[in-house]
Regions:
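Structured, active/binding-site neighborhoods that engage oxygen-rich ligands
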Residues: 1-317
Length: 317
């Protein structure tokens, strides 16, 4: 057992929820990178005071999909996680972004399951097309699989991919494997390069996902103080205009790579940079928040971020 395992799980879960809460106000598409910079400048704390934070799909997924373990007592499979989808998600109400068939990856997969299309076919490129299968949901619902596998990135990646295959395929699965592996590795090291190396070891090196991490890493090595320059590079070479769908995983993977590199192991700075980069702000800050929460532990999470949560979490199923 990893020393202080319960505390690190708690810190990781706090980190995820803090990142989501920080990024949520600027998630809507009209909050461009330029607008966030103009309105908020250098973010150094919450930009909105929530008395209560509503249920969020980025939290629902990691919590409810774990029911597959409770219900079966076995390692997750696409089939067992698909059954958890059907058992615990109420169609059209809360839980996911119910954006419509062929628009929302999760809505499409859910309707596939209801119509008798089993997992993993329900989330496959063959069934839904590449654009839908490679949206960001592949990596944003998998945090708890990493929390379950301390110090074992390979097992975390396997669990995450099994769960993600209900709704995603291709690069979406690489994102699932990467994020879960990073979280698992963060239990045994706080060195960001070691953490990301563990994640990259679980995905094909010829993938776009690995390529964007390498390019961000190379830019950081050449310009270690210029995260905004790195963001401009992402816009030019890996931006939303290059990928189909509402919220593709690759540009947002680039933001996570940037935030992890330039955050340099500091919890607060990592989630702040992820938020200032725009695109899917709550998802990206949530993912890196889990990784850094585990790596830094409770002592590394500033009270100004932790205290407003008051250990309160709202879910919707």
């Amino acid at each position: 057992m990893v020393p202080s395992y319960p505390e690190k799980v708690y810190a990781g879960f706090l980190g995820m929820n803090i990142g989501i809460r920080l990024g949520a106000p600027v998630e809507p598409a009209f909050w461009s990178y330029e607008r966030i910079r103009e309105v908020y400048g250098d973010i150094r704390g919450y930009i909105k005071d929530y008395s209560h934070f509503a249920a969020d799909d980025d939290v629902n997924g990691p919590v409810f999909f774990l029911r597959a373990l409770d219900d079966t007592g076995a390692a997750p499979t696409p089939g067992s996680v698909a059954q958890a989808w059907l058992n615990y998600a109420r169609e059209g109400v809360g839980f996911y972004w119910w954006g419509g068939f062929g628009v929302s990856t999760e809505h499409t997969a859910y309707l596939n399951l209801k119509n008798g299309i089993p997992a993993p076919q329900s989330g496959s490129i063959r069934q839904n097309g590449q654009a839908l299968a490679e949206q960001i949901g592949g990596q944003i619902f998998i945090d708890t699989w990493g929390l379950l596998c301390p110090g074992d990135p390979a097992r975390a990646a396997r669990y995450a991919v099994a769960a993600a295959r209900v709704s995603h395929d291709g690069e979406g699965l690489h994102g699932a494997a990467f994020m879960a592996a990073c979280i698992a590795k963060a239990f045994v090291t706080s060195a960001v390069r070691e953490i990301t190396a563990a994640g990259l070891a679980q995905i094909p090196q010829g993938s776009l996902y690995a390529a964007v991490f390498r390019e961000v890493g190379a830019y950081h090595d050449a310009h270690p103080e210029d995260w905004r320059g790195c963001r401009q590079m992402l816009e030019k070479s890996w931006g939303y205009d290059r990928y189909p769908g509402a919220c593709h995983i690759i540009p947002n993977a680039g933001v996570c790579a940037l935030a992890l590199a330039y955050g340099a192991g500091d919890f607060a700075r990592t989630i702040e940079i992820a938020t200032m980069c725009s695109w899917d702000t709550d998802c990206n800050a949530g993912n890196v928040g889990t990784i850094l929460g585990v790596a830094c532990g409770l002592a590394g999470i500033p009270a100004g971020y932790r205290d407003p949560l008051e250990d309160e979490l709202v879910l919707s199923g």
